[in-house]
């Protein structure tokens, strides 16, 4: 199950699909307020978004999933594993964090969104999501990402950005029982290496992988390396479950 970042949609996972579909059933979804999912009244909470994911898992009838989330998706994954541990077989937390350092930055972004719309956030978002060399040399991809950002409903952004701003779950991380890997781009300014190290240190048994020359959307900047990490981890966990005679969707 793949969970998207703020200001994106399920299409952000396209680089990972060929490899994953060769071995697994893959469920991508648009988080509340994004893509084709319903936009409800803001604000939202990360717990609410995790409950959305749990409801989707129940609806599909798969029982439990190997969950991978990037940025906001990883924040949702943490809460999902805490609130609904029976629905999580393994957890891949990518370019994410357990809390954000200050609400002021998010309040500024929310003000910009209200005054200028999503278009007022695009340039700053691109700078945070990708290293300069990637922006300079990957015009087609950057244009696709720009279009994706611009499709984000304003109220959906406000709802989810408020959830990210208000998130505080570091103190809950030791409750996570699912096997966990943490993946981060070394140059990520949005959810930093230091924030990933908090996840590594606080989640029992978590393993950290750092991708060089990548920023926030490491799955797009370094798709081969990112996908291999994801594929290998899920494969290992699925094999372990199979050997124990347990379901391994």
Q: Language-model segments: which ranges?
A:
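Conserved acidic catalytic loop of the alpha/beta-hydrolase fold
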Residues: 48-65
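Conserved HGGG/HGGXW glycine-rich cap/lid loop of the alpha/beta-hydrolase fold
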Residues: 1-42
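Residue in the alpha/beta-hydrolase core beta-strand immediately N-terminal to the catalytic nucleophile
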Residues: 30, 66, 89-92
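Acidic catalytic loop of the alpha/beta-hydrolase fold
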Residues: 186-191
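Short beta-strand/loop motif that positions the catalytic acidic residue
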Residues: 176, 182-184
């Amino acid at each position: 199950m793949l969970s998207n970042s703020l200001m994106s949609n399920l299409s952000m996972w396209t680089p990972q699909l060929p490899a994953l579909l060769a071995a697994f059933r893959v469920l991508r979804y648009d988080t509340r307020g994004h893509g084709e999912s319903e936009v409800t009244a803001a604000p939202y909470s990360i717990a609410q978004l995790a409950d959305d994911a749990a409801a989707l898992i129940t609806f599909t009838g798969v029982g439990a999933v190997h969950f991978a989330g990037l940025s906001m998706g990883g924040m949702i994954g943490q809460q999902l594993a805490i609130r609904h541990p029976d629905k999580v077989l393994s957890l891949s937390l990518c370019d994410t964090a357990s809390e954000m350092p200050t609400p002021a930055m998010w309040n500024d972004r929310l003000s910009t969104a209200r005054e200028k719309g999503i278009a007022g956030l695009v340039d700053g978002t691109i700078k945070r999501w990708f290293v300069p060399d990637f922006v300079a040399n990957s015009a087609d991809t950057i244009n696709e990402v720009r279009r994706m950002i611009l499709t984000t409903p304003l109220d959906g952004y406000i709802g989810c950005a408020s959830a990210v701003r208000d998130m505080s779950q570091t103190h809950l991380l030791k409750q996570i029982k699912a096997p966990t890997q943490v993946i981060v781009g070394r140059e990520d300014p949005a959810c930093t290496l230091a924030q990933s190290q908090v996840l590594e240190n606080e989640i029992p048994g978590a393993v950290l992988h750092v991708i060089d020359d990548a920023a926030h959307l490491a799955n797009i900047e370094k798709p081969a390396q990112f996908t291999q990490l994801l594929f290998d981890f899920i494969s290992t966990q699925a094999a372990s479950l199979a050997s124990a005679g347990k379901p391994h969707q």
